[in-house]
């Protein structure tokens, strides 16, 4: 997966979060970014990375997202690796 494909997955995740008031509010509370600002920064790779971190931190939300968009459950983690800060080595 390349950066462009990763950004597409992350934008789908952002759309998924934005469509659910509870989820976007949880993301806003955790990130410290107002919901409107999250949407406005949709083109920001660091914001998209944060969206993916949030998605990957909750298995139920991740599963719902993958089902809603017919995405392989492994794709979000691969997408995250191709966004800013995702190239960190795994030590496990």
What are these regions (language model features)?
Residues 1-92:
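Metal- and O2-centered redox machinery and metal/ROS homeostasis
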